[in-house]
């Protein structure tokens, strides 16, 4: 599975590999490899941060769009019991209206 991040990394790797110059200094190659690895690690960290933020936002939206567990439990108790304290039609309407 590729995301929009991978083509950038592949481009950096491709440009580095297609170098036709003959380098006699092996330290430069090691530094370049380290730089690419650092960039890839930074991209992975940023990707994880973005995914974490998306998950947090999704959880906020879920909590906004659905009643709390307390309300859910109260509705379940009242619909499952033989209690006449709340009309079952009202409970069904509330349940449907809030998306339970």
UniProtKB/Swiss-Prot annotation:
Domain of life: Viruses
Induction: Expressed in the late phase of the viral replicative cycle.
Upper taxonomic lineage: Viruses, Varidnaviria, Bamfordvirae, Nucleocytoviricota, Pokkesviricetes
UniProt record similarity statement: Belongs to the orthopoxvirus OPG197 family.
InterPro entries: Orthopox_B11R
Protein name per the record: Protein OPG197
């Amino acid at each position: 599975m590729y995301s929009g991040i991978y083509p950038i990394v592949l481009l950096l790797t491709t440009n580095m590999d297609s170098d036709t110059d003959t380098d006699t200094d092996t330290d430069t190659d090691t530094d370049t490899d380290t730089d690419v690895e650092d960039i890839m690690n930074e991209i992975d960290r940023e990707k994880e941060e973005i995914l974490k933020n998306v998950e947090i936002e999704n959880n906020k939206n879920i909590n906004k769009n659905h009643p709390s567990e307390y309300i859910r439990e109260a509705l379940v108790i009242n619909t499952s019991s033989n209690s006449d304290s709340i009309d079952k039609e009202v409970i069904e309407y509330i349940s449907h209206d809030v998306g339970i």
